[in-house]
Amino acid sequence: IREQLDSLFAQTYTDWTLFVRDDGSTDNTISIIESYQKEHHNIVIIDNEGKNLGPFMNFMELLQKVDSPLYMFIDQDDVWLPHKIENEIAAFRSLNCDETTPGLIFTNLQLVDENLNVLSASFWKSIHFSPYIFNSFTEQAFIGYITGCTMLFNKKAKEISFPVAQYAPMHDWWVAICIYKANGKVGFVETPQMLYRKHGNNVTGNFVSSQKGKNLCVRFKEMTTQYQLMKNCGAVSSFFNYICLKSKIKNARKNI
């Protein structure tokens, strides 16, 4: 958490406020944040009212309570590169969104291990993703390529993200889906803007995972779950549509 906070306070863009909602952590996270509060006026700790909501709804609860023209999600063990906020705001301004138009910027990132050794200099390249090829509602619903810790979005995007559907799997997937469905503007920064720690069991993106070593039963179960999610959000109308989309995306990624 200290590395994350230090990277935040090392940003070239400084006009921001950090809102924190602790979701029942049992370590010394809050005490560390409180120590930073003594030196920095722009940290606000939100009362969790004794509720443990899980990662998804913890982010959404915090988002709902904060009023701001722009929002960014931040994970406690990632490291932001110094120009991250500055570069994303510049990219957002180029979208020319008015107050009635939801807008979103997402970026590439570097995958690192727990000691910040680089595992992949480009997350997008490692998963065979290009925003020049994939940048639509159905593709986001399928791939989940917009990662929460790289997102910057406006107040209108926040407003249309509520209420939250029960079928939504994660905050980043859901907010991005809502923006696409509302015909909002989505842009990106191609260069990595942060270091994302890859732990043993964590997953970046909702369906970005290797199928190697999985038996047919497991694969079919995962496909069924993904299809149902995409049907619920309106990305596909039938299992046949889902299979066609899956094949199209698979073939496109071979050339990236």
Language model regions located:
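Intrinsic low-complexity, intrinsically disordered segments enriched in polar/basic residues
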Residues: L53, L63, N115, K214-C217, ...
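Nucleotide-sugar donor-binding/catalytic module of glycosyltransferases
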Residues: I1-S209
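Enrichment for repetitive, rod-forming helical segments
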Residues: A91, Q226, C233, R253-N255
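General helical structural elements
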Residues: S25, M223, K250-A252
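Membrane-interface aromatic/basic loop that binds lipid-linked glycans or pyrophosphate carriers
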Residues: A235-I256
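Catalytic core of nucleotide-sugar-dependent glycosyltransferases
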Residues: S130-P131, Y196-F239
